[in-house]
Amino acid sequence: MARERLYRMTEIQRNMLVVALMDEYRKQKARGVPYPPIGRLAVRAEDAPRHKHRLPWDKERLYDLYLNDAEWRMARDALNALRSWRFSVGKGDGGTDDALLRVMSAKYKKAPER
């Protein structure tokens, strides 16, 4: 078992991550330098398994996504670019900040085999 960062995200944060990664993928594809790992990470984030709650009153849907260091950097950079874009157009950024904070504070855990 490898040690990877566990990004435990809500459904909204998962959607933000997928949108941010797909935006980065489209930008790189438009430049003529597609980077397939970004697309694969977006698909993995979309298909992330639900977190198993230990207590019955935990109602918030959480999803577990294990990230190696390169994937963690891609997720961090993509969410930061989305946050910067939202600042530039004057939209609220509270949700993007929460998603970025959760990615930055992801701890190393024993990841299951892929």
Residue ranges and their predicted role:
Residues 1-114:
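Positively charged, low-complexity terminal tracts
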